[in-house]
Amino acid sequence: MSKKNIKKVVLAYSGGLDTSAIIPWLKENYDCEVIAFAADVGQGDEELEGLREKAIKTGASECYIVDLKDEFVSDYIYPTITTGAVYEGQYLLGTSMARPIIAKAQVEIARKVGADALCHGCTGKGNDQVRFEGTFAALAPELTVIAPWREWDMVSREDLLAYLAERDIKTTASATKIYSRDANAWHISHEGGELEDPWCEPTKEVWTMTVSPEDAPNTPERVEVSFEHGRMVKVNGEALSPYQCLVKLNELAGAHGVGRIDIVENRLVGMKSRGCYETPGGTVMLAAYKALESLVLDKAALKYREQIGLEFSHVMYDGRWFTPLNDALLAGAASFADKVTGDIVVKLYKGQATVTQRRSPNSLYSEDFATFGADDVYDQSHAEGFIRLYSLSSRISALNKEGIPFKNTGIE
């Protein structure tokens, strides 16, 4: 669709520097109506305060703010937890999880208002452009997608600030606000500025969701969490909604410096990037979930669930939520999650979340079998035959290698 044919655009709007500049840019370059859309995924009231007024002052005809907190936690975070997914062994996928629900809601607004185009403010170097546009392609292939960072000639924060100043558009952004941050109920990410140098240690000013582990209380705190069929339902015996459970754990774990990571990751677009992430409540939830899994799943089931988690981490990171593969992976994880019911105690101390107690009505653990003391339920002599069969292929391989005939070796 040519620029002349685009009449109404729905913009994924955050109120930050990029999307503040995109509104007037769209009107100037596409001569179209701009409708702003913002998703409340638990980033905090301060991020949403005055957002509608700001969008309209900047040139939007309307701004829709949609509360997605409960849906985000119930339909995206919890299914992800059941897969056990951790991208490249460290990243708990906080930004990745939020993109499909935001893009889906943006499509729904576009359909509601009769828009013919969708717009996002993602950089042409990042993962989010793929995540947003992959969702658009899956849910609204007929709508045109506009990506200003791949069109305009502005390349820096200073360029954007100058662009807004020329149009007398006020913004709270400044050239000194160097970090790029993205927050939701699960986490907050920090990128940019001196963090782009992997040899530069993050200062205390980088972190906003957790206290420094060095400054955390000198006394550990224990928190008990309860799951039913893979969903957390209680924190310290108090029944809470999925979203409230996460909020509570963010508060408790953040006070003990839990959930910080500083990593270099492989972006989908081919380059490496350095990011600092805070996921306090999520770190506790995932540790507790996996501890309960280890109690209720047998060896083969747990191994397969781990394979699901590895594949799912890339599906989620790469923006492939709305795909048949993702549906299959989540269905597999859900079948295992149905058994994940029970209670876990996690000790929070100086940046660490350590599981110390576990119980489940579905537990496969038997103290009678596991004891190192005397028992009447397990005949240890039975292990000999098992080991002989288990190691048979290794024994045959060794005999072949040494040229020893099988005869009189006990194999024939």
Swiss-Prot record:
L-aspartate binds at residues 123, 127-128. Its EC number is 6.3.4.5. It catalyses: L-citrulline + L-aspartate + ATP = 2-(N(omega)-L-arginino)succinate + AMP + diphosphate + H(+). One of its GO terms (molecular function) is ATP binding. Its main location: cytoplasm. Pathway: Amino-acid biosynthesis; L-arginine biosynthesis; L-arginine from L-ornithine and carbamoyl phosphate: step 2/3. Pfam families: Arginosuc_syn_C, Arginosuc_synth. Keywords: Amino-acid biosynthesis, Arginine biosynthesis, ATP-binding, Cytoplasm, Ligase, Nucleotide-binding. Signal peptide: none annotated. GO terms for biological process: argininosuccinate metabolic process; L-arginine biosynthetic process; urea cycle. Belongs to the argininosuccinate synthase family. Type 1 subfamily. This is Argininosuccinate synthase. It comes from Pseudoalteromonas atlantica (strain T6c / ATCC BAA-1087).
